[in-house]
């Protein structure tokens, strides 16, 4: 995959050269920011599988969007928002299905724990598929 670097640079006395203010490495899902005020390089690594899927998808289908987000210094905000929204959307969808699915409700009423857990897991995987299609692979 790719490594994106911002056009804006700052001098790093530690490295004794100009370094990009922002960098994104889609392989290791890490954003690096060189803070010119403190002269410190700060990194944030993402671990969610859907962030990896989104970065790899975006890298191959719309690299200009990633390049723009890195250049504008908005890549961390963008990925944090995606992480939060996807993490909230999956359980919200699962909850909706649990409220409306008659098989699940019958299992709850009868106390069939095996069926409750099985349907709950099924709902999670179904929700991931739907949410990923709508929010990750765009």
Residue ranges and their predicted role:
Residues 54-111:
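Aromatic-anchored, charged helix-turn/loop surface patch used as a conserved interaction hotspot
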Residues 18-74:
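Short N-terminal mixed-charge amphipathic segments
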Residues 99-138:
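C-terminal charged interaction modules
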Residues 2-19:
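Ligand/cofactor pocket segment of small-molecule handling proteins
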Residues 1-2, 28-36, 121, 129:
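Long, non-globular targeting/processing and low-complexity regions
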Residues 1, 45-48, 103-107:
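General structural signal for secondary-structure boundaries
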